[in-house]
Amino acid sequence: MTSDPQKNAFDLDYSSRERQFPEGFKRKIVADLQEGMPQFDVLQYFGNQPDIFETYDHLVLATDPEGERIIGILGAKDFVRGSTCFLYLWTAMVVDRYHRTSLFKRINQFFLRQVSERNGGLPPLIVAKTYNPVVYNMFRALSARIPGATLYPDLEAPRQCPDMVDLARDVVGTLSANLRLDAETGLIPGGQRSVAPDFFPRMAMSSHARTNDHFVAHVGSSDQILCMVRLAPGAEPYVQQRIIR
């Protein structure tokens, strides 16, 4: 387990797949998140995926040092399918009182530093699927900051890049044989229903109007949008120095 040395409002700890969390600690993680996110069905999310803590390859937990409560989580898994390698951001939650703070940004930076160190570099492709426009907006902002990075779906493009569409279909097929993709919108019909249909009480809006409009127009309460950022060859030094420093 690795800790973030900058300890002010919270502590960050990273664990790899080799960890073995006691059942009581896993229950504490879920209970603390549910208490801190009372309008979200955290119990359903983890209850529908009982082996999820054993499945994550990478896990960051944010803890409030005062009460020793879990206040944030980012869990991910490495996937390899043929020549395609990608990092799937599986779970991302921050309790209500830390919304609009630096916590989520710090979790992401710390997480990517640890993944890069453990894996000998960042993956060429970072993936999530989400009902939340804020998550897509994070991918959009990340791709805009990294020279040569490619975003999918690109809401500013008249049509999606054909090779990114092919990649997106491979990714969805790798994640689940039961899911399908609408290639032009990035929509995965039923994606949220397959995970936790009652998790979100509502659709939160991001700071980007185009992103919000896309989600409102295409995403129902049972659906998700696939989000992908492909890094260009040679992007690693820039990401290390400018993004996850």
Q: What role is predicted for each listed range?
A:
Residues M37-D41, G67-I71, F104-N108, M203-A209:
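A short linear-motif detector with a strong N-terminal bias
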Residues Y14-V94, V115:
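A conserved beta-strand-loop-helix scaffold within acyl/acetyltransferase catalytic domains
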